[in-house]
């Protein structure tokens, strides 16, 4: 329903090459969402007969423009059967005119007639100088070569001859692909190995009048004619990889700076490609040298960065693009007065905390030592849970318990007084006799029933409210049968407002699973996630919830799923926290979730049974944890109390965008005729998967159908019973 807006386009453009690793609808959409400005198709690895379907697939998933990058005037190894061959040093091999399968003694070059241009004595370096051969003879079938420096040679890899060879600026494949691009109304084209102005004019003749031509500078000839090429082009692209075949590596930084300066002087855009994040082809994070190189490239004045192999064949295309986006954002953000000052909020691609800042309110050592001198107010366990979540930022932007004006604003407008969307009153009820012992301006110690202090409150207001009016606006009823209303009236009509500081967390038997918002954000960032689905639950996993989780992952193309069970106060008959966590840990241990896609972390919270208000509230809590999406079940947060799914959606739609996308699911059922899961209302053959029924099966010691709950999960729960551990709150 509520789409997280695309990340703002950066002034510095990001170009991504699509290939086997990224030619997938969901990956394309993710790259689009990250702010990629141009998708590159490398025609050196694309045949004309495949191009139309490739363009169609890309355009069906994004509106981002496509750039056809030509093969150009270059020599490459042939398309071997194997991915690579090995040429042994001092061996004699044949470079064929015709296509051959490729082995240690026979291979071919591309284009096929290039061998006619070779001369005896030519030195030929292959695959970025890893192999060096020399032409020693010419025969009808091809050229005879002696291997001076042996090694592995990949198929379709770059070849350099030690003298200039005149080649057509466009191959036959290029010309066929340009015709398809023209037919498909593509507007961006890159000319590889541009050597002179005539080359640029040639590609303009074969494309649209208003085509955006990017000329690639990757040879000494191109460098010599840089001004003429730039004059005829819309932009330049420095391909540092191919350029380094003719320019010594130690001179590449100097040459890069000179090209960028010339382009700027001529008012031409200039992009930089090759080896930006080479290590991330296999590793999830870059090297420090790569990060430093990118920053210096931006300092040089580059208008854009091009990801090539990193996103085309690398193992982490989204992580690569995310890293570049973070670096660009860091470069473009306002500079600190002191560059050595570390910013409070590092660059993150995760959804921004609600209100723009993750609240952190932990008492200092000195403040903790002073709590014994404070007036003590004994409060409920749920109030202490609120203190903990306020302090760790789960309720950001709240810094404490609401005053009268803020509560009224939330109940009347679903917004805080500053206009920020917020739907849940967060109140601290205090008996009149207790409230009379302190006043506005005092600092009060908030203690549990055991007398232990867990938080402090800086009192800003003490006020009363009409509980029936509050209940009607909050829960849409004043019935004491509603558990939320009952809790409200039990606390009384006197409330205390003020900022909170956490002194100590409540004891927990599941602390090892609990993650604060800062911790969950750290984990997501460490995994390279920026699009995360949150799932909040009070129950062990069953097939219905599993279907929702996997379907949401598939439909949204999210990087990962954050399963966030609640582990604190429950109603009689609810599942205990232990069995819930055990069921999910069993799924993870047995590899039943997609590998690397799921994080399990619990939250100390409680239900308020506030229907659509609570849906939005729990969504905002997940947003603060770093989730961009949030799954809503039809029985979410106790909506069986006085609320219907339709009214929930109407309420949520009335709020507008609040920065997290909700993914709604109706009750999931299993179709016995097709063995498929889907909405329970879809077919008469659908059998609804119901939490209440699962509880009944477990209480009665009956086996649950496999289609309702996995057998391994059932076994884990039955093992708890066998250990005399209770599954339910009694």
Please give the residue ranges for each predicted region.
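Non-catalytic helical/linker scaffolds that mediate oligomerization, partner binding
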Residues: 2-344
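Active-site cores that bind ATP or allylic diphosphates and position pyrophosphate for catalysis
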Residues: 345-730
């Amino acid at each position: 329903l509520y789409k997280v807006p695309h990340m703002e386009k950066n002034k510095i453009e990001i170009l991504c090459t699509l290939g086997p690793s990224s030619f997938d609808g969901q990956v394309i959409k993710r790259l689009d969402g990250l702010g990629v400005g141009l998708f590159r198709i490398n025609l050196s690895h694309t045949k004309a007969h495949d191009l139309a379907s490739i363009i169609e697939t890309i355009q069906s998933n994004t509106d981002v423009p496509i750039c056809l990058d030509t093969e150009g005037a270059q020599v490459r190894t042939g398309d071997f059967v194997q991915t690579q061959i090995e040429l042994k040093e001092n061996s004699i091999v044949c470079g064929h005119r015709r296509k051959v399968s490729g082995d240690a003694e026979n291979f071919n070059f591309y284009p096929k007639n290039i061998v006619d241009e070779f001369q005896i004595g030519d030195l030929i370096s292959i695959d970025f100088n890893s192999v060096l051969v020399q032409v020693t003879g010419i025969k009808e079938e091809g050229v005879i070569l002696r291997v001076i420096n042996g090694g592995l040679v990949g198929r379709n890899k770059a070849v350099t001859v030690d003298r200039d060879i005149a080649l057509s600026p466009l191959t036959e494949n290029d010309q066929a692909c340009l015709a398809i691009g023209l037919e498909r109304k593509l507007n961006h084209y890159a000319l590889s190995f541009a050597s002179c102005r005539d080359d640029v004019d040639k590609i303009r003749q074969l494309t649209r009048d208003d085509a955006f031509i990017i000329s690639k500078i990757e040879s000494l000839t191109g460098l010599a004619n840089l001004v003429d090429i730039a004059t005829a082009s819309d932009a330049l692209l420095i391909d540092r990889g191919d350029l380094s075949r003719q320019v010594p590596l130690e001179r590449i930084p100097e040459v890069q700076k000179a090209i960028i300066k010339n382009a700027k002087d001529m008012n031409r855009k200039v992009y930089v490609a090759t080896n930006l994040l080479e290590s991330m082809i296999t590793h999830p994070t870059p090297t420090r040298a790569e990060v430093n190189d990118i920053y210096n490239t931006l300092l040089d004045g580059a208008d854009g960065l091009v990801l090539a192999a990193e996103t085309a064949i690398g193992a982490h295309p989204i992580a690569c693009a995310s890293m570049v986006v973070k670096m660009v954002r860091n470069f473009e953000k306002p500079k600190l007065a002191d560059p050595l000052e570390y910013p409070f909020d590092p660059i993150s691609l995760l959804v921004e905390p609600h209100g723009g800042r993750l609240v952190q309110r932990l008492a200092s050592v000195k403040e903790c030592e002073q709590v014994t001198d404070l007036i003590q107010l004994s409060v409920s366990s749920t109030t202490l849970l609120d203190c903990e979540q306020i302090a760790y930022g789960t309720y950001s932007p709240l810094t404490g318990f609401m005053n009268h004006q803020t509560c009224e604003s939330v109940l009347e407008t679903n917004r805080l007084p500053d206009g920020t969307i917020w739907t849940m009153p967060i109140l601290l009820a205090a008996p009149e006799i207790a409230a009379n012992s302190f006043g506005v301006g005092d600092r009060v110690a908030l203690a549990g029933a055991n007398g232990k202090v867990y938080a402090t409150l800086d009192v800003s207001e003490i006020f009363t409210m009409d509980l029936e009016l509050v209940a009607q606006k909050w829960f849409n009823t004043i019935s004491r049968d509603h558990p939320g209303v009952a809790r409200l009236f039990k606390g009384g009509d006197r409330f205390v407002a003020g900022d909170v500081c956490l002194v100590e967390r409540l004891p927990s038997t599941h602390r090892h699973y609990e993650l604060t918002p800062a911790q969950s954000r750290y984990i997501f960032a460490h995994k390279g996630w920026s699009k995360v689905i949150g799932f909040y639950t009070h129950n062990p996993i069953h097939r219905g919830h599993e279907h929702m989780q996997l379907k949401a992952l598939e439909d949204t193309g999210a990087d990962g799923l954050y399963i966030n069970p609640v582990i604190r106060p429950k109603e009689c008959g609810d599942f205990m926290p232990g069995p819930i966590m055990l069921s999910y840990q069993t799924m993870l241990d047995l590899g039943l979730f997609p590998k690397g896609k799921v994080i399990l972390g619990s939250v100390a919270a409680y239900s308020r049974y506030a229907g659509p208000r609570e849906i939005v509230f729990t969504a905002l809590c997940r947003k603060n944890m770093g989730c961009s999406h949030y799954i809503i079940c039809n029985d979410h947060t106790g909506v069986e109390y006085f609320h219907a799914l339709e009214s929930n959606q109407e309420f949520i739609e009335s709020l507008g965008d609040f920065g997290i996308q909700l993914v709604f699911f109706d009750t999931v059922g299993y179709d016995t005729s097709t063995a498929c899961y889907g909405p329970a209302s879809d077919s008469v053959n659908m059998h609804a998967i119901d939490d209440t029924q699962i509880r009944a099966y477990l209480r009665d010691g009956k086996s649950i159908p496999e289609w309702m709950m996995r057998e391994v999960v059932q076994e884990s729960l039955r093992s708890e019973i066998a250990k005399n551990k209770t599954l339910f709150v009694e």
